[in-house]
A protein has these predicted regions:
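Formylglycine-dependent sulfatase
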Residues: 1-258
Length: 258
């Protein structure tokens, strides 16, 4: 039997945010354990400095400049249109592993096209739950104990009917090819993505076939938002943004430890 594979990707996690790289403010014991037991690539570079092409490089193994995917999608970008995404001729690691008999799943952030031809279940993933674009709310800021920085972002998120921070369309968490919205903002997003990842692993561990999970967390990417149970771990950090960022990283690390 081929080995199972879990690829975990953080979003906007800095080199100095992880204990294994001598971070002195943040706590990442689970990520540190992986680093200690495995290999640290201290001279590795991302394929691009921004989200979408960097992810394209990771999943295809090719420089994104070679297939014309060099920019993020966003409302201020000329590339924000349904025809822009990861070229359909490019194979992803999901495509390759599907061919090798793997059950493939993506939980989390895609950010490589919103049209059907770019949808994850058409790009090598048997299952998908997550968001298609760059960011969304981590929860409903109207709920007690939710911390947001800056506070005006809380007002923008609370103004929506479902507690989702809509900087652009397609920001909801979707499930499967039907694009069914699946969250109501009451469960912290990082915890939700962890739970769905664990569910995928546990379900497929019972199969005779190997599985590949791409767990693409949104944390600690903006919006800077966290729930009280993580915020309370860092009373010594007085700067509000730094404290929320530390708490978001702690929630990510807890998920890795699951």
């Amino acid at each position: 039997r081929q080995p199972n594979i879990v690829l975990i990707l953080a979003d906007d996690l800095g080199y100095a945010d992880v204990g294994a790289y001598k971070a002195d403010r943040y706590q990442t014991p689970n990520i540190d354990k992986l680093a200690k037991q495995g290999v640290r690539f201290t001279a590795a570079y991302a394929a691009a400095p921004v989200c979408a092409p960097s992810r394209a490089g990771l999943l295809t193994g090719r420089y994104p400049q070679r297939f014309g995917f060099e920019f993020n999608q966003g409302p201020g970008n000329r590339e924000f249109k349904e025809g822009y995404g990861l070229d359909a001729k490019e194979l992803t690691i999901g495509n390759v592993l599907q061919t090798a008999g793997y059950k493939t799943g993506l939980v989390g952030k895609w950010h490589m096209g919103i049209a059907d031809q770019f949808y994850p279940t058409n790009r090598g993933f048997d299952e998908f739950v997550g968001l298609l674009t760059a960011e969304t709310s981590y929860g409903d800021p109207a709920q007690p104990g939710v911390r947001v920085w800056p506070k005006d972002r809380a007002a923008a998120a609370a103004a929506t009917k479902d507690g989702v921070f809509h900087r652009w369309p397609h920001a909801k968490i979707l499930d499967g090819p039907s694009r069914t919205p699946v969250t109501d903002g009451k469960e912290y997003l990082t915890d939700y993505l962890t739970n769905r990842s664990v569910e995928f692993i546990e379900r497929n561990a019972k199969s005779d076939n190997p599985y590949f999970l791409y767990a693409a967390y949104t944390a600690p990417h903006s919006p800077h938002m966290v729930v009280q149970k993580y915020y309370d771990r860092f009373p010594e950090i007085k700067d509000e943004l730094q404290r929320i960022n530390a708490a978001m990283i702690a929630s990510l690390d807890d998920g890795v430890g699951r």
